[in-house]
Amino acid sequence: MAMIPFPVIDPVATGANICRLRKDRGLTVRDLQSYFGFEEPQAIYKWQRGQSLPSVDNLYALSALLQVPMNEIIIPTSHIVSFEQQAAVCCS
């Protein structure tokens, strides 16, 4: 059984990175709330705490706002899984 690295996003580290990048650009949570058109800022706070991740569309927009590529926002981690385990996740 072959073992391969399976990339996984670290939500807590990614959230901390979103917070850092936002602050580095001099933006507030309210600025992001307004940019995304959210009625409340809770989604931004959840991203920053790692309780949820932005959708792909929101991640793409966030990268434009922060002026960084999407892969500089996401903090990965790796888990080693077998091909069979990966196939079960991807193809079920």
Feature annotation, model-predicted:
Residues 2-8, 64, 74-92:
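Short, charged recognition helix plus adjacent turn
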Residues 47-48, 58, 77:
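DNA major-groove recognition helix of helix-turn-helix
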Residues 22, 33, 63:
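The alpha-helix within a helix-turn-helix
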Residues 16, 27, 39, 54-57:
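Residue-level signal for the short linker/turn that defines the boundary of a DNA-recognition helix
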Residues 1-24:
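A short, Lys/Arg-rich alpha-helix, primarily the initiator
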Residues 26-46:
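Short alpha-helical DNA-recognition segment
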Residues 19, 30, 60:
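Residues within the helices of the helix-turn-helix
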Residues 57-72:
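DNA major-groove recognition helix of helix-turn-helix/homeodomain DNA-binding modules
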